[in-house]
Amino acid sequence: MSIVTTSFDMMSQKTGTTHDKEMLISGLDHVNLLVPPQTLHLAYSFYASTLGLAPAVVPASCKAHLAWFHIGNSGQQIHITSQHYLSQIQLKAQTESPRHPCFKVPSEDKLNRLQRLIWALYESGGEGAPVYCDEPGNDNAGQGAAGDFPKRFFARDYAGNRLEFTL
């Protein structure tokens, strides 16, 4: 058994290992998000209609509890799983979790438009509306006084999944 020791240099933000090794991971294929049972129609509404992600083909045997969406032409996807066996405690923990995917938006104009769109849906409420969105025009996304972070905002979909949008 071989043990690999890693280090992280905060100044250069480079990770070093004690031996050279070929890169084994070439990218990220998908991120899976959970939603309550019987709500895949809301996932299609939010992720396809609001965010503009293109639905992908799901295996026929899984259509009742899965929805997949392409993220542009990147080859990456968002998978949505409707789990009938999730307890209310598990669903509550999900809605309070800081874990999140971060979506890259091509321009500041489109980022601002998307934030206004999600904010309007949040404000309107109702079934399928986001349960949270950073208010447009406020520095509530943690930009920091020094501008340490790129322009971004956070929202939570109708099921409480935390989502980040950035340049």
Per-segment meaning from a language model:
Residues 13-15, 64, 85-90, 138-143:
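A short, acidic/glycine-rich surface segment
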Residues 22-25, 33-78, 82-83:
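Core segments of cupin and vicinal oxygen chelate
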Residues 26-27, 94-98, 146-147:
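Short glycine-enriched loop/turn motifs at secondary-structure junctions
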Residues 2-44, 101:
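N-terminal beta-strand motif that seeds the catalytic metal site of vicinal oxygen chelate
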Residues 35-41, 101-159:
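Vicinal oxygen chelate
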Residues 80-83, 87-105:
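Helix-adjacent hinge/juxtasegments
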